[in-house]
Design a protein with these regions (language model features):
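Positively charged N-terminal leader segments that act as targeting/secretion signals
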Residues: 4-12
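Conserved PLP-anchoring active-site segment centered on the Schiff-base-forming lysine
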Residues: 159-178
Length: 252
């Protein structure tokens, strides 16, 4: 019998008497082959997948926290597995996803345009609605133009990876969001990490940069994992001192 989570000092130490059998079963599901045919004659990737059963063990223990299906509106209270529970993880701070006006507009847009775009925005997936939205946002924030993305992760992935070149620099906080880190990895620029919210560390990294090269400082506004706020006044001060540009991911 599977031991309860509270009895295990660490998740990876859960005692599963049938652990090996479970792993074999999971491996056979991944490989779409009968358990009887399961053997060691697997390629390295399949073998690696077969050995990784932590998610299945977490599900069996009832502590797997991901991909829980919600069967209700996105409100402060939602229904999961038939139970009404409080939602503390929502990004919908305004509640607009359930605003009757937004719902009606979405219905009308579906009637006119269909249920989705038939291509990427770069080719044939840009609708007049997208351009109208970009124009209204640009007017609202007082900028010449804006570019909208479908996700916040996509913004940082797309922008951070393309703004700078091979001989330029990206300076980033060690607690930056994963999307910033992935965008930095895709860039060909030189990457310099500074200690979390440590302005002395940031300045030392700025001093390492060649003066005539582009320097992009990328930081969260509110750090999503810790909840603390970036020292933007000091970051801007240093950016002016070393002729750098600041990019802020203001997601929260």
């Amino acid at each position: 019998m599977l031991k309860k989570a509270k009895e295990a000092p660490r998740f990876k130490l859960f005692l599963l008497p049938l652990r090996l059998h479970l792993r074999r079963a999971v491996a056979c599901i991944i490989l779409r082959m009968p358990i009887a045919e399961f053997s060691h004659d697997m390629k390295p990737l399949q073998a690696k997948l077969a050995k990784y059963t932590v998610p299945q063990e977490a599900k069996a223990a009832g502590i797997y926290p991901y991909f829980r299906a919600i069967s209700s509106e996105q409100d402060p209270e939602v229904i999961i597995n038939g139970r009404r529970v409080l939602m503390f993880g929502s990004n919908c701070y305004t509640g607009l996803v359930n605003d009757p006006r937004i719902k009606e507009a979405a219905i009308e847009a579906t009637r006119k345009y269909g249920t989705g775009c038939a291509g990427s925005p770069f080719l044939n997936g840009t609708l007049d609605l997208h351009k109208q939205l970009e124009a209204r946002i640009a007017e609202y924030i007082g900028k010449e133009d804006v570019m909208i993305y479908s996700t916040g992760f996509g913004v940082n992935l797309g922008v951070v990876s393309t703004l700078t070149g091979r001989e330029d620099y990206i300076l980033w906080d060690e607690q930056d969001h994963a999307s910033i880190i992935e965008g930095r990895r895709l860039s060909f620029s030189q990457s310099l990490k500074y200690k979390h919210n440590d302005m002395e560390s940031l300045e030392k990294q700025l001093q390492r940069c060649e003066p005539d090269k582009i320097k992009l400082i990328v930081t969260d506004g509110v750090f999503s994992m810790e909840g603390d706020v970036a020292n933007l006044p000091k970051i801007v001060e240093l950016a002016k001192k070393y002729n750098a540009t600041v990019m802020v991911d203001e997601a929260h």
